[in-house]
Amino acid sequence: MATTLDLKSKEEKDAELDKRIEALRRKNEALIRRYQEIEEDRKKAELEGVAVTAPRKSRSMEKENMAVEEKSLGPSRRTPGTPRPPGASRGGRTHPQQGGRAGVGRASQGWEDGAGEQLRGGPGGRGRRGRGRGSPHLLGAGDNSTSDRKSKEWEERRRQNIEKMNEEMEKIAEYERNQREGVLEPNPVRNFLDDPRRRGGPLEESERDRREGSRRHGRNWGGSDFERVRSGLEQERQGRRAGLGSGGDMTMSMTGRERSEYLRWKQEREKIDQERLQRHRKPTGQWRREWDAEKTDGMFKDGPAPTHELSHRYDDQAWARPPKPPTFGEFLSQHKAEVSSRRRRKNSRPQAKVAPRAYSDHDNRWETREEAVSSAPESSQSISLEETPTQASETPAPAHRPPEEDGEEDVGEEEEGEEEGEDEEDEEWEDVSEDVTEEEEEEEEEFEEDEEGPKDQEAATVPDHQPEAEPAGKPTCEQVDPVPAGSQELLSPVPVEPPIPFSPSEDHQPVSDWGEEMELNSPGTAHLPGTHSSGEAWPFANA
């Protein structure tokens, strides 16, 4: 029983393989027929002078042919005597088995038979290629008739498509020849590549009609004709420029209420502009500022330019502050000239003359006490007067200021607050310092006249050494305050240490640390009632 079943199974398997081989043969016939039709169409197109590109599926068809041959070769390699595995019933695999020549012969025979049928014009098997890939059932007579009918319909449709394509290719070739030769066709609408909008020169009636019947909507930006967009934009710009100068044109598109509001706003702006221009002029009609003299009245007839408003916006705020603009403008120009002259004088003046005003009152105090004090040793005074002029210039002037100068500074600040409208914080500080220095110069002259009397008394009390030291001592008194005070303190009868660390006496040796030396000697020193030691802030002990 087992052997009979095996034999039946082998016979059934052989029958299935035969069916598959037949289906593959039919598929190959259809592919060969299709390939031959494509070649015929290509030859025909070449004869007509139209270049046709190669079909894209040629490579895929070759792959299909190779796959068909492999499938046809695979199942036929086994011999009738060898058993077939159950999983290989689909027939898509190739097994390395014996006897491959018979299968090759059958496949080649099928290919040749298909080619022979095609050359003889046999029935088309194009509809069977979908079922030929491993279909297990047999193809009946009904299937053959339906497939033949479908293939004929497909052939008819394909022939019509080829004819249409040939006509279009002929039209394209003729159009290209005419374009090269410069000949216009009588009916350019038929050419699907023709676009009269891209052409230049005079337009014919047909092209003009076509352009008028454009696909663009009339409300689109630029209208139906896109070439008029650039010229339309230029005309619009010119009209806008012309409308800027005249205000009546702007009101044409306004309603009554908008027009009245616009006219009221326009009058207010013109009034403000005129007031601003009047603030910039003197009562005589001249410009207050020199750089405005270049302006002409014609610049403001249509209204001032926006750049003019921007350049004077900050000035308008500054001019509105003072109560009397005309007098302030005149004073401001004079004040600026004075400030520049003061700066020149300050730069040319020596730096040492700025400080002496701070200690002028204290010098009077020390000079009045000098009259009751006897003279000190001449050698110590001469040493101190020779060494101090160079050292006193190095000492910085303290930041203290007498109450009189504070009052003067306040007065100067009030004047500057009225004078400076734009740059109050910057120029006030510089101008106050310059005013104070000028007033200090005047007060210095007064104090020099007042100090001439005490100086004469000094010369009378100390006739021995004062004439020698006066040429050096007098300028130091005008320049630096601590120097004459220190020199006068040396005139006390009680021997005291030098008031300034840099002017030692005869018997004193210089030391490295003067602070320590002063602390050691301060308890044993004797001072007059009202005098101060050198370590204290003696210039401010006037209270």
From Swiss-Prot:
UniProt cross-references to InterPro entries, sorted A to Z: DUF4594
Biased composition range(s): Acidic residues: 405-453
Pfam families: DUF4594
Chain positions with Asymmetric dimethylarginine modification: 129, 131, 133
Positions of the UniProt region annotated as Disordered: 38-543
Gene Ontology CC: exon-exon junction complex
Coiled coil, from the record: 147-183, 422-452
Entry keyword set: Coiled coil, Methylation, Phosphoprotein
GO MF terms held by the record: RNA binding
Phosphothreonine: residues bearing it: 94
Coiled coil keyword on record: yes
Compositional bias of kind Polar residues: 376-394
Residues with the Phosphoserine modification: 135, 246, 253, 374, 384, 533
Domain of life the protein comes from: Eukaryota
UniProt biased composition (Basic and acidic residues): 38-47, 59-72, 146-183, 192-212, 225-239, 256-277, 287-300, 309-318, 359-372
Residues where Omega-N-methylarginine is found: 106, 120, 126, 128
Name of this chain's protein: Coiled-coil domain-containing protein 9
